[in-house]
Amino acid sequence: MKISKEKYASMYGPTTGDRFRLADTTLIAKIEKDYTIYGEESKFGGGKTVRDGMAQSPTAVDVADLIITNAIIIDYTGIYKADIGIKDGKILAIGKSGNPNLCDGITEGLEIGANTEILSAEGKIITAGGIDTHIHFISPGQINEALSSGVTTMIGGGTGPNTGTNATTCTPGEWNISKMIQSVDDLPLNFGFMGKGNSSSYEALKVQIEAGAMGLKLHEDWGSTPNAIDTCLSVADDFDVQVAIHTDTLNESGFVEATVGAFKNRTIHTFHSEGAGGGHAPDIMKVAGLSNVLPSSTNPTLPYTKNTIEEHLDMLMVCHHLSPKIPEDVSFAESRIRGKTIAAEDVLHDLGAISITSSDSQAMGRVGEVIIRTWQVAHSMKQQRGTLEGDDEKSDNNRIKRYIAKYTINPAIACGIDEYVGSVEVGKMADLVLWNRAFFGVKPEIIIKGGFIALAMMGDSNASIPTPEPNMYRLMFGSLGRASGATSVIFTSKVASSNLKDKLGISKNVLPVKNTRNIGKANMKLNDFIGDIEIDSETYDVKINGEPIESNYVEKVPMARRYFMF
């Protein structure tokens, strides 16, 4: 029996070779492979196949806790269609689900039984939960904003709206680190806290790693001197944790070459590598071409629009405790906001030279816009630069995989947590996001945290069905009680991980970061460009390997007003 492609897609979602648009962008995804079996698809509902003795085995007991059926998976590993099995909060298997007594080709681990729940994803997209590595923990209100955007892991530093936290992503000292870990214990996300890395004292930094910091942050407002950089990286090497850096905008303790020299070819994660958010003016962006640097961007400059420059000056004055009445403060602010380097930042993302996107939450960046702005850049670059190498006029899979890697697998690798999160792969935590294709990147439908639904777009709770308006994000059972702790984790250093849970009396599991010191740009998935980046100190013109970068601001972006009328 044959049915039309249109009818098949309406019942089971698109299949191999079918194409679809991401939200209202010009990005077109093409399904590379379909792991389901035509005519044997698992589908739940009245008169459908997932019933006892049909696609549900009447005898199976040890089965997946949840199976997501017929999902379109968009991941750095590929764009494909499959069923996803989840057990004990982790991805158990990806492939074809069903009853092996009746159907050949059932993937091991995807047998459906009486102990299996079903989430129907026909025609919908599944991605890994986003990872934001640049969080200023200023306000707890950021948590729900991030979660409702599709972010499931938040990494950074801070202690609330203290002046230091407003400007820098550091949680300084054992007591502050302990209190922050305890404070997020009932929140349905993974967290990691970075200690203050600005010290010439090895011991002062060691104490923070032993207290539970997952890494260290160097920030110019605390003094990112070559000696502080060297000391911080020495501690990181000894304890296998990552160092993030916001370099010296004013070039007080040396120019960018002095900072790179202090790295001594050791691995480091550079924040807002373009420089509008901070860093050696005007040429910090050079570091994005180095083999030992893991470069990231923050979202306020992404993508470059006609309003970017004007918005940034006021933001910068507030975030860094500057005064418009002090000429030196105004000069400091103006030195960081450069249209040509901001324009070049988008191109560096498209080339894979900048590997990671993040927010810089409430400190010049927007915590709920990491994902949306990443895709806006991808759209803008397709409009300006055309088809990416390896793609064709009918699909943009290579570009799509490059950009999704920027907020999933690459931040995970940079922070040493890719064994646990960052992609849709067997064995990893089931931190997954379900999207309607028309709302992809803008408004997720369901956020699954550790295999359990934590947040969802939900209608009136007094209605007779789940869908009546008002539809809004509401916390689900995965966010309540002890479930939130059981389905999420705290990332810490190895040295702190063994006894931290009992020491602090927390319910979240504690996992150690790993393999942060033996990696480099070559490990950044689909974003591993290494080359010579030059910035003219007078004109701010940018060249890559001697070739000038050309890019303009855009006047309109997708994924914007039409999605936020209500």
Swiss-Prot record:
InterPro entries: Amidohydro-rel, Metal-dep_hydrolase_composite, Metal_Hydrolase, Urease_alpha_N_dom, Urease_alpha_subunit, Urease_AS, Urease_asu, Urease_asu_c. Its EC number is 3.5.1.5. It is an enzyme of class 3 (hydrolase). Ni(2+) 2 binds at residues 217, 246, 272. NCBIfam families: PRK13207.1 (NF009686), urease_alph (TIGR01792). Heterohexamer of 3 UreA (alpha) and 3 UreB (beta) subunits. PROSITE patterns: UREASE_1 (PS01120), UREASE_2 (PS00145), UREASE_3 (PS51368). Keywords: Cytoplasm, Hydrolase, Metal-binding, Nickel. The keyword Metal-binding applies. GO terms for biological process: urea catabolic process. Pathway: Nitrogen metabolism; urea degradation; CO(2) and NH(3) from urea (urease route): step 1/1. Belongs to the metallo-dependent hydrolases superfamily. Urease alpha subunit family. It comes from the Bacteria. It catalyses: urea + 2 H2O + H(+) = hydrogencarbonate + 2 NH4(+). This is Urease subunit beta. It is found in: Cytoplasm. One of its GO terms (cellular component) is cytoplasm.
